[in-house]
C-alpha cells in the first residue's frame, strides 16, 4: 500500500462554457477498470443527447490502468489532454467524463485541447483534491478529568481526533503516521501521568485537503 496518494475530494460535476459550447466535467473515484467504464456509460446514458462524452481514467498505485477516449472528437484533442491534467495533479483512482453540448462554433484542434483540459482543471478546483495518508488509528482511554488536556495537546500538535466516545471513561481515536505513534504515546503518558490505555485499531487512510 502507498504511504500517501492524491485523489478527488468527492464525486461531483462542474460546467464551463466556451464560445457557446457547454463542457460539463463529471468526476468519480474508481478502483477498477470495470467501475470506470460503468461510470462512463452512466454519464453517456444521462447525456445521450450530448454531442460528445469524452473520458479518461487512472487506476492503481503505479497508474497501471489508464485510458483516454475522444468519443468522436478529433484524435488526441479530448481524452489525452484530460488524462494529462489528472497526471499533472498526481491523482490516482479517478475517472472523469467531459460532456460537450455543441454551441455552433467550431474550436479547432488547439481550441478543443484547451477546452477539454480546462474543463477538467476547473472541475478539480471546484470539487477539491485530498491527500490520503496511511496512518495508524490509535484509541486512547482515559478519565473525564483529562479531556481538556488531550484535546488541547492534539490541537496544538495537529493530530486529528477522528472519533470520541463518552461512557464510563473517555475514548478518543487519533490518526497518526505510523512512525509518530511511539513518540505520541510517550507524550500522552507523560501528560496524563500514566493514567491512559492505548489500543491500535489498525491502519487506514486519512484524507487531508490539498490547497
Segment roles from a protein language model:
Residues 1-76, 199-211:
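C-terminal regulatory domains involved in ligand/effector binding and gene-expression control
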Residues 161-165, 192-209:
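Conserved short beta-strand edge segments in small beta-sheet-based binding/regulatory domains
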Residues 141-159:
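Short amphipathic alpha-helix segments
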Residues 174-183:
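Terminal, non-globular segments
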Residues 128-144:
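Short glycine-/aliphatic-rich beta-strand segments at the starts of folded cytosolic domains
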Residues 150-155, 183-192:
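Short amphipathic alpha-helices in soluble, non-transmembrane regions
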Residues 78-126:
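Active-site beta-strand/loop microenvironment that shapes enzyme catalytic pockets
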Amino acid at each position: 500500500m502507498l504511504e500517501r496518494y492524491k485523489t478527488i475530494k468527492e464525486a461531483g460535476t462542474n460546467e464551463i462554457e466556451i464560445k457557446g459550447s457547454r463542457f460539463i466535467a463529471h468526476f468519480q473515484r474508481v478502483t477498477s477498470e470495470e467501475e470506470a467504464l460503468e461510470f462512463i456509460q452512466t454519464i453517456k446514458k444521462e447525456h445521450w443527447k450530448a454531442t460528445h462524452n469524452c473520458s479518461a481514467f487512472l487506476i492503481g498505485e503505479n497508474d497501471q490502468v489508464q485510458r483516454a477516449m475522444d468519443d468522436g472528437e478529433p484524435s488526441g484533442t479530448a481524452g489525452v489532454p484530460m488524462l494529462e491534467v489528472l497526471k499533472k495533479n498526481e491523482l490516482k483512482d479517478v475517472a472523469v467524463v467531459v460532456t460537450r453540448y455543441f454551441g455552433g462554433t467550431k474550436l479547432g484542434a488547439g481550441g478543443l485541447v484547451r477546452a477539454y483540459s480546462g474543463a477538467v482543471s476547473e472541475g478539480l478546483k471546484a470539487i477539491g483534491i485530498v491527500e490520503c495518508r496511511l496512518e495508524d488509528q490509535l484509541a486512547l482511554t482515559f478519565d473525564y478529568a483529562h479531556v481538556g488536556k488531550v484535546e488541547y495537546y492534539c490541537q496544538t500538535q495537529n493530530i486529528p481526533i477522528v472519533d470520541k466516545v463518552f461512557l464510563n471513561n473517555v475514548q478518543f481515536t487519533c490518526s497518526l503516521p505510523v512512525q509518530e505513534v511511539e513518540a505520541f504515546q510517550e507524550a500522552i503518558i507523560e501528560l496524563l501521568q500514566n493514567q491512559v490505555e492505548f489500543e491500535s485499531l489498525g491502519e487506514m487512510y486519512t484524507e487531508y485537503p490539498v490547497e
